[in-house]
Amino acid sequence: MCPLPFARILSSCLALMLAVPALARPQAPPAAGLATEVRQLTVAALELPSRDEGQWKQRREQVLQLLTDLQPDVISVQQVLQQQGRNPACWLASRLRYSCDFVTADPPSQPVRHGNAMLSRLPVSEDGVTLLHPPGTFSAAGMMRLRLGDNDVNVYVARLRPEPDEATARQHQTSDLMTWIGATAEGMPSLIAGDFSASTVELVRSTPGFQPARRNPGAPAASGGGASGHGLDVLFQVKHFGGIRQQAIMLPADGDLPGLRLGVMATLRLQDVAATTE
């Protein structure tokens, strides 16, 4: 893979690691279809049903089947724990035949590493990672440059829930992310998939040019207990994308295991270049 130059402009005292993909990058573009289909992109933002390894093994086949049925082009997985090299998000990627990038600030020598994951079934040409300030457990943000038909699209993944979750800290992290996007997007259409503790009004104000895909942010966005703010969502650049639809990602009940809301999936259409420059 070819990391972006800005991914390397970090303080030398920080150990930001991007895991080796679980699979080789997909080499073939999506199956040919109508032109409108090639310009559509489906992006899921979710959390796994449990970060406990034993409980995860109880439900991972069910989650795998759910994502196999949904077939999102890109999956952002929040709050992933990698234990002794075992990564649940990359396990899913290996079964789905997606690539998997684990974005973390923890060094490889750490037994348990905290981060977020980016899964894609589209070809990935570049990726990068940066650290949002103030630093925290999940404050590493990542990006992938994907090939969608004849177009390149940037997908940024971040968890904007600083520790402590205060307005000044949220503003600082969001400002860091937007500055990084401005430095690395190279004018290409861009999305942000992640988890946001800011209110919807604050989120829209702090990410100019982007719009949340979720029409009803008051609804619970994930299974995580007590999460506040806007929650899991996909933000898209209004000058480059149009929202087609969004849907909740629901894990059905399975015997004694309850049904869970894992996140959301947005279906977006890439606008014509001529239309976006008028």
Language-model-detected regions and their locations in the chain:
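N-terminal signal peptide c-region/cleavage motif recognized by signal peptidases
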Residues: 19-21
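Active-site beta-strand/loop signature of hydrolases that rely on acidic residues for catalysis
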Residues: 42-48, 63-86, 119, 144, ...
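Metal-dependent phosphoester-hydrolase catalytic domains
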Residues: 16, 25-33, 182-191, 197-278
